[in-house]
Amino acid sequence: MTPPTASFINPATAGPQPGSFKLSKGSLHACSTTAAPKYEQYVPIKTGEEPIEDFNGHYRFAEIKESHTSRAMTARYMADMMDAAVSDVVIIGAGSAGLTCAYTLAKQRPDLRITMLEASVAPGGGAWLGGQLMSGMVIRKPAHNLLVEIGVPFDDEGSYVVVKHAALFTSTLMSKLLAMDNVKLFNATCCEDLIIKKDQTGAQRVNGVVTNWTLVTMAHGLQSCMDPQTITAPVVIGACGHDGPFGAFSVKRLSSAGLIKLGDMRPMDMNKSEGLIVNNTREVFPGLIVSGMELSEHDGHPRMGASFGGMIGSGQKAAYEAIKLYDSLEIDDGEVVGLKH
């Protein structure tokens, strides 16, 4: 039996969507507070004003108004926010571990709705460069199998491979991930808190995240009363990297709430670290799976430096752990109401 999924709108079956109809005069005041006004988003190309791709001084764009741009962006972003308000899995952090996790999870389970949060404008975390701002990306085997799968070329150096530029891996992975229908990415959006509730046994459980735009979060010391939003999800995955401005967020928040004790990341030992990170990727607190370097802050594993195999393997392991966890839960509209027997 297919497990229940979050109540996302299916554009193919939900009937007329925002943007299907022309906004009539006065309808902003007359419309319900629960429904967005409708508007005409399709702009027909007028005869005699057809776009021309001529680079000899006659290049001409199709006509558009500024309001078309604003409405096109706003309608889609707000529709995404409405859909993601109840998700099946939320991944905090879109670095190498988070992106790999989302790709693996979305591919394995297209029935699950996956929401990613990334505090930076540019997803990818530290995976745009190798070590010390150099371009090459080192990946130890067998994690290179993901490169083969997504079509990223590399130099085979025996026990490891080298991608000529880390950005090639990250951009390729993102292009495949974001093309998937069951994945939504909110970048420039950070996690400010976790939703923690008691489950049916009375135990504390992570059941979603509290979000805000990163620039708002950074301005909390300058302004007051800038409240966040929430995303409800039965499974949350922390992939925020090691300690930093937004790093290791999930485990640091649990620690500050007195719910766990951090192990703190140990000094570098590349050979030891990567295997420990992958093999120990798990649910560290009910409802929260932790992967990548965030796990090193929780468990006290050594740092691994500029070798990315551990991040890839940990992201994949987190995806498989998320599937097992999700399939073990009884879920009602994103909230855990029991365990399957």
UniProtKB/Swiss-Prot annotation:
Q: What is the free-text note on the cofactor?
A: Binds 1 Fe cation per subunit.
Which key words tag this protein in UniProt?
Cytoplasm, Iron, Metal-binding, NAD, Nucleus, Thiamine biosynthesis, Transferase
Q: Does the keyword Ubl conjugation apply?
A: no
According to its UniProt record, which cofactors does this protein need?
Fe cation
GO cellular component terms, alphabetically, are: cytosol; nucleus
In this chain, where does the modification 2,3-didehydroalanine (Cys) occur? 225
State a single Gene Ontology molecular function. cysteine-dependent adenosine diphosphate thiazole synthase activity
Q: What's a BP term from Gene Ontology annotated to this protein? A: thiazole biosynthetic process
| Protein EC | 2.4.2.60
PTM field:
During the catalytic reaction, a sulfide is transferred from Cys-225 to a reaction intermediate, generating a dehydroalanine residue.
Q: Which InterPro entries match?
A: FAD/NAD-bd_sf, Sti35, Thi4_fam
Q: Per its UniProt record, what SUPFAM superfamilies does this chain match?
A: FAD/NAD(P)-binding domain (SSF51905)
Say where the protein is mainly found: cytoplasm
The record's subunit annotation is: Homooctamer.
Q: Which NCBIfam families match?
A: sulfide-dependent adenosine diphosphate thiazole synthase
Q: Which PANTHER family match?
A: THIAMINE THIAZOLE SYNTHASE
What family does this chain come from, according to its entry?
Belongs to the THI4 family.
Q: What is this protein called?
A: Thiamine thiazole synthase
Question: What organism is the protein native to?
Answer: Mycosarcoma maydis
Q: What is the organism lineage in this UniProt record?
A: Eukaryota, Fungi, Dikarya, Basidiomycota, Ustilaginomycotina
